[in-house]
């Protein structure tokens, strides 16, 4: 039990969980402002990581990223979203690792820890192309050792997914502020008209 509690406390320290009482650990609800801050940091850090990775990547690491992309596509095809999510996260973190910048990798890990539950909640609603479409462009840029193209592709990946994530976070924030499901559905319907 001690090891589990230590692991849970580490997740609290990483801001992936919130400790409400000694026995009550919860996934934090991100505010819109907090989500936008994390997304802005991911854009900068993962963009820099992709740029640097394109300059430094070796054939073995590139092959690993290609395998992760294929595994992600396979998981999506068999509707295994848990596996697809793991592959998606591993791809992003592997790209950060390929940059050869350990501090950057730690920051990216920390940001992913904070947003993993949110990404999991929204991933099911993404189209297959949205889930991995930009990953193909990243691989192409890495093969060509094209740092600016790699940066652009990872930024587009984060932004495209971020649109749906932002809508989800806004909805969650309104729910916690007391809006009813019916009110939110009506607002969403009016916005679509």
Where are these regions (language model features)?
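C-terminal regulatory/effector modules of DNA-binding transcriptional regulators
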Residues: 124-193
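Short helix-capping/hinge motifs at transmembrane helix termini and TM-loop junctions
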Residues: 54-55, 100, 123-125
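Short, intrinsically disordered/low-complexity patches at protein termini
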Residues: 42-43, 51, 61-62, 86, ...
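Intrinsically disordered, low-complexity segments enriched in polar/charged residues with Gly/Pro
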Residues: 3-4, 14, 60-62, 126
């Amino acid at each position: 039990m001690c090891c589990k509690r230590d692991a849970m406390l580490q997740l609290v320290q990483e801001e992936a969980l919130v400790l409400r009482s000694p026995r009550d650990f919860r996934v934090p609800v991100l505010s819109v402002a907090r989500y936008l801050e994390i997304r802005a940091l991911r854009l900068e850090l993962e963009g820099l990581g992709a740029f640097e990775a394109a300059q430094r990547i070796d054939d073995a690491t590139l092959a690993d990223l290609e395998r992760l992309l294929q595994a992600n596509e396979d998981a999506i095809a068999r509707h295994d979203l848990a596996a697809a999510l793991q592959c998606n996260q591993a791809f992003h973190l592997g790209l950060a690792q390929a940059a050869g910048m350990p501090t950057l990798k730690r920051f990216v890990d920390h940001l992913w820890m904070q947003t993993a539950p949110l990404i999991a909640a929204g991933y099911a609603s993404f189209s297959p192309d949205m889930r991995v479409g930009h990953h193909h462009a990243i691989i192409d840029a890495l093969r060509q050792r094209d740092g600016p193209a790699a940066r652009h592709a990872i930024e587009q990946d984060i932004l495209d997914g971020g649109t749906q994530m932002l809508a989800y976070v806004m909805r969650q924030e309104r729910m916690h502020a007391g809006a009813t499901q019916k009110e939110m559905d009506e607002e969403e319907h009016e916005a679509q008209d």
